[in-house]
Amino acid sequence: MNIIEQFEKEQIEKLLEQRGVPQFSPGDTLRVHVKVIEGNRQRVQVYEGVCIARRNAALNSSFTVRKISFGEGVERIFPLYAPTIDRIEVVRRGKVRRAKLYYLRGRQGRSARIIEDTTATQQALAVEREISQERKASGKDQASKPEVRPQGKKPAPKPKAKK
């Protein structure tokens, strides 16, 4: 390992201590909180969409998130360790068999949907509970931990009775 790789590894460890990055892969629906500076004000903007690609290259790692905004597909590439990213939340896990989901660009509506991977969501919740219990035991419960929420299905409405 040369000195540059060693320096990058140290920087990644320091960044992970400050802001945890959750485990996610292409197909997952992400909610990325981005710091936006407008003049002398700073605010956090939320960008939610499907992760269609992930590039793992040490400190230069990035991921692409695609969402449909007013009928148009919008893709944004985020550097994983950028200081402008406040936090990343995994909204739901997707079940896909590809590393790059560029085929979603040509699809619309139902054909662009990704099946939810319920087993991965349950495993992630179990791991998250274990981590939170360990933090409570050690007294280091932080508010900036990555959040994983399963998106449950709502029950179908009951049909109305005819009078």
Swiss-Prot record:
It comes from the Bacteria. Residues 151-163 have a biased composition (Basic residues). Keywords: Ribonucleoprotein, Ribosomal protein. GO terms for biological process: translation. GO terms for molecular function: structural constituent of ribosome. Residues 131-150 have a biased composition (Basic and acidic residues). Residues 131-163 are annotated as: Disordered. One of its GO terms (cellular component) is cytosolic large ribosomal subunit. Disulfide bonds: none annotated. Belongs to the bacterial ribosomal protein bL19 family. This protein is located at the 30S-50S ribosomal subunit interface and may play a role in the structure and function of the aminoacyl-tRNA binding site. This is Large ribosomal subunit protein bL19. It comes from Rhodospirillum rubrum (strain ATCC 11170 / ATH 1.1.1 / DSM 467 / LMG 4362 / NCIMB 8255 / S1).
